[in-house]
A protein has these predicted regions:
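Helix N-cap motif at beta-to-alpha junctions
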Residues: 363-372
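A glycine-rich phosphate-binding loop feature that marks nucleotide/adenosyl-phosphate handling sites
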Residues: 7-8, 87-98, 169-177, 208-224, ...
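A common structural junction motif
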Residues: 377-387, 495-499
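Single conserved hydrophobic/aromatic residue that forms the stacking wall/gate
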Residues: 1-6, 10
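N-terminal beta1-alpha1 cap of cysteine-dependent amidohydrolase-like domains
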Residues: 406-530
C-alpha cells in the first residue's frame, strides 16, 4: 500500500476502545517508594587498590590476585548462565528450515556463540530478518528501570553484527514477569514499564506486542512455617529487524587478516558489578548497578554499523553475562586460537571490575592499520575505544603493565570448563559414552572441524554436460504426514536445473499421478515414522 492508502485504512479502522470492550473499569493503584537494603557478608579477599596497574604490588599480593582471577574465570565460565548451551541445541533438528541464514553455531568447529538468529525471506533472495534477545533480570533486584534499559541494549548489541537500515527499524516484543500484589513488586513493574517506554521512544524502537505473567510467586508451608519464593521483575526483549543482504553480516568467527587485533568499544567508562555473575558466585554486595542512556546506545550502534558497512570491522562479540573475560574466551573457543590481552590502560578500576563487569560494550576484530581511523571516529561519538591485544597461540593470556602474566590458561581447558554443565546434562540425558567422546574432542588438536571431502570425480564441464537448462528433467518430491523439508528439497532441485513437482502419497493412491511421468524421485523423511 502507498502511504496515503495505508493512512485511509488506518483511519477507517481507528475506533474508540469503548466500542470494542465497553467501559473498562480503571482501577487506581498507589505504590510507595521503598529502598532495597541488602545485608550480604562480603567474601571478596582481593583489593587491588581499584587500579588495573598491579605491577607495583609485592610478589605475594600479586600472586593472590592471579589466583583469585584464575578461580573467578573458571567459576564464571562454568556458571549455567554463561556456559555452553549446546545440550539445548543439538537435541533439535537444525536442518529443517532451508531459509535459516544463521543459527546458534558458528565456524568450522560449530561452537554456540552466535549473537543473533537470521532468516531469509525466500530461497531466491538475500534479504531477510535478524532476531535477537535481551534480558537482565538480576539487575532488577537493585534497579528495575536499569534492568529494562540494559535488556533493550543487550538485544540491540546482539544484532549489531548485522547491517540494519537504522535503529528505528527494529521492532520488539516485551515479555513481562513479576510477582504483583505487593507494594515493592508493583512499584518495580511500574518503574520497568515506564523506563522501557521512555527508552524505546528515544531510540525510535516500537514494541507492538508482548505478554505478561504477573503472579510469579510460589508459597508453601513446612513445619508450621510459611515460605515464599518470588521472581524479580523481569522483562525479556525479543527484537527483530529487516536485513537487506544477509551476506554482509559478521559473526564471532575471525577473518583472515594481515595484522588482526582486538579492540574494546564501550559507550561509557563504567565497570559496575551489581547483578553480575561474579557477584552471584562470591555472594558479594556492590553499590552500583550497570545502566545505559539512549544516547550512549545510539552512538555505539551507529559506530558499529558504519564500521561493518565500510568493511573495517570483521568479527564482533558483545559483552553480556560473565563480562569481557567471557566475551574474549568465547571468541577463542569459536576460532580455536588464543589471544594476548594487556591491562595497560587508564580505566582506574580493579582487574576484577574490568574482566567481570557486564556493562554494555563489544569486542571487535579489526586490522591494526585501521586503529587510528576507527579510534578518531569512536571518540567523535563519545565512545571508549581501547586496544586490547593480539590474536594468536593456544593460550588466553592477560598481561599487566609490565607485560607480566596476570592470567594464562590453555583455551581448550577453558572451553572444557565452559562446556562442563552442558556435558553433564548430555551425559544424563543422552548416551554417556557419546557425550564423553564429544567433550574430549575439545582438547584434541587433531580436530579440524567441518570440512568437505569430495570422493567422487566432478565433470570438467560441470552440470552443463547434463544439459539440464534445456531439457529440465522432472523430479517428483514425495511427501506424506509428518514430512518436513519438502520445500527445501524442491528448491535445491530447481536451483540445480530440474523441474520439481509436489506429489502427495494420496495422489499415488488415487492414481492421480504416475511416477512413470518423472525422471527422478526424492522422498523426504519425517518425524511420524520414528
Amino acid at each position: 500500500l502507498s502511504s496515503s492508502a495505508a493512512s485511509d485504512v488506518y483511519k477507517r479502522q481507528d475506533v474508540p476502545l469503548s466500542m470494542l470492550f465497553g467501559e473498562l473499569p480503571l482501577e487506581k493503584k498507589v505504590v510507595q517508594e521503598e529502598k532495597n537494603v541488602f545485608n550480604v557478608e562480603q567474601k571478596i579477599a582481593i583489593d587491588a587498590d581499584n587500579d588495573l596497574d598491579i605491577s607495583e604490588l609485592d610478589p605475594k599480593a600479586k600472586e593472590s590476585v592471579k589466583k583469585h582471577i584464575e578461580k573467578s574465570a573458571e567459576n564464571v565460565l562454568s556458571h549455567p548462565t554463561v556456559g555452553s548451551k549446546s545440550f539445548l541445541i543439538t537435541i533439535g533438528d537444525r536442518s529443517v528450515g532451508g531459509m535459516v541464514a544463521r543459527d546458534q553455531f558458528v565456524g568450522k568447529w560449530q561452537v554456540p556463540t552466535s549473537n543473533y538468529a537470521m532468516s531469509l525471506r525466500s530461497f531466491d533472495d538475500v534479504c531477510g530478518e535478524v532476531i535477537s534477545i535481551g534480558e537482565r533480570p538480576a539487575l532488577s533486584i537493585h534497579n528495575a528501570a536499569a534492568s529494562m534499559r540494559m535488556a533493550v541494549a543487550e538485544a540491540v548489541t546482539n544484532m549489531m553484527s548485522v547491517p540494519i537500515e537504522s535503529i528505528s527499524s527494529i521492532r520488539a516484543s516485551a515479555n513481562w514477569m513479576a510477582a504483583c500484589g505487593e507494594n515493592i513488586e508493583d512499584l518495580n513493574l511500574r518503574k520497568g514499564v515506564e523506563a522501557l517506554s521512555n527508552f524505546c521512544i528515544d531510540l525510535g524502537i516500537a514494541i507492538p506486542v508482548g505478554k505478561d505473567s504477573l503472579s510469579m510467586r510460589t508459597t508453601w508451608e513446612k513445619d508450621q512455617s510459611n515460605f515464599t519464593v518470588k521472581s524479580p521483575m523481569t522483562g525479556i526483549i525479543s527484537a527483530m529487524a529487516p536485513v537487506k543482504d544477509v551476506r554482509t553480516s559478521i559473526t564471532t568467527e575471525y577473518k583472515n587478516l594481515e595484522d588482526p587485533c582486538l579492540v574494546l568499544v564501550k559507550p561509557n567508562n563504567f565497570f559496575r558489578l551489581n547483578g553480575s555473575i561474579y557477584q552471584d558466585i562470591f555472594e558479594t554486595s556492590f553499590t552500583d548497578t550497570p545502566d545505559i542512556s539512549s544516547e550512549e546506545l545510539l552512538n555505539l550502534f551507529n559506530f558499529i554499523q558504519s564500521g561493518i558497512n565500510k568493511k573495517n570491522i570483521h568479527a564482533l562479540h558483545d559483552i553480556s553475562d560473565g563480562g569481557i573475560l567471557t566475551t574474549l574466551s568465547e571468541l577463542c573457543f569459536t576460532n580455536k586460537i588464543g589471544c594476548s590481552i594487556s591491562l595497560d590502560n587508564n580505566f582506574q578500576v580493579s582487574p576484577e571490575q574490568f574482566l567481570f563487569s557486564e556493562e554494555i560494550g563489544v569486542v571487535i576484530q579489526i586490522n591494526e592499520s585501521k586503529l587510528k581511523e576507527l579510534k578518531q571516529s569512536a571518540h567523535s561519538q563519545n565512545l571508549i575505544f581501547q586496544y586490547l591485544g593480539k590474536i594468536g597461540g593456544s593460550n588466553f593470556d592477560i598481561l599487566d603493565k609490565n607485560k607480566d602474566k596476570l592470567f594464562s590458561r590453555d583455551i581448550a581447558e577453558l572451553e572444557q570448563a565452559w562446556s562442563q554443565v552442558s556435558y553433564r546434562i548430555k551425559s544424563i540425558r543422552d548416551n554417556k559414552d557419546d557425550a564423553k567422546s564429544e567433550f574430549d574432542l575439545i582438547s584434541k588438536t587433531s580436530n579440524t572441524g567441518l570440512f568437505a571431502n569430495d570422493s567422487f570425480k566432478q565433470p570438467k564441464k560441470g552440470l552443463k554436460i547434463l544439459n539440464l537448462l534445456k531439457n529440465k528433467p522432472k523430479v517428483a518430491i514425495l511427501r506424506e504426514q509428518g514430512v518436513n523439508g519438502q520445500n527445501e528439497m524442491a528448491a535445491a532441485f530447481i536451483k540445480a536445473g530440474f523441474e520439481a513437482h509436489d506429489i502427495h502419497m494420496q495422489d499415488l493412491l488415487e492414481q492421480k499421478k504416475d511416477l512413470n511421468q518423472f525422471n527422478g524421485l526424492a522422498v523426504c523423511g519425517g518425524f511420524s515414522y520414528g
